[in-house]
Curated annotation (Swiss-Prot):
It comes from Aspergillus fumigatus (strain ATCC MYA-4609 / CBS 101355 / FGSC A1100 / Af293) (Neosartorya fumigata). Gene3D superfamilies: Mitochondrial import inner membrane translocase subunit tim13 like domains. This is Mitochondrial import inner membrane translocase subunit tim13. It is a peripheral membrane protein. GO terms for molecular function: metal ion binding; protein transporter activity. Heterohexamer; composed of 3 copies of TIM8 and 3 copies of TIM13, named soluble 70 kDa complex. Associates with the TIM22 complex, whose core is composed of TIM22 and TIM54. Interacts with the transmembrane regions of multi-pass transmembrane proteins in transit. It is found in: Mitochondrion inner membrane. Disulfide bonds join 47-70, 51-66. Its main location: mitochondrion.
Amino acid sequence: MAIWGSSSSNTASSGEADIKTHLMNQVRQEAAVTNARNLIGKVNEHCFEACIPNPGTSLSSAEHTCLSQCMEKYISFWNAVSRGYIARLANERKAYGGGALDASFVQSGESSL
C-alpha cells in the first residue's frame, strides 16, 4: 500500500540515522583520544619538570611519589574543567534550542588515566 514509497523512505531515514550515529560516535572517540594525548603531554611537561630536576637512570622514591601526586592532581583538575566546560556547552545548547548533551559525551570528556 505504499504508493508514495513511505516504507522505503523509512528505511532510508533509518539508514541515514545509523550513519549519523556512527559518525558521531567516531568523532567522540577521536575527541577522547585527542584529549588523552593532550592530557598526557601536559602531565609530562608540568609534572616531569616539577618532580625531576636532575634526570638520572632511575626514579628515587621521592620523585616517584611526587610524579604520582602531581599526575593525580592534574588529572583531577582536568576532569573538573572538562565537566564545567561540558555543562556550559549543554546550557548554551539548551538556550539555543539544541537540546542537552547525552551522558556518553559527558563521560567521554573525562579522563580516567
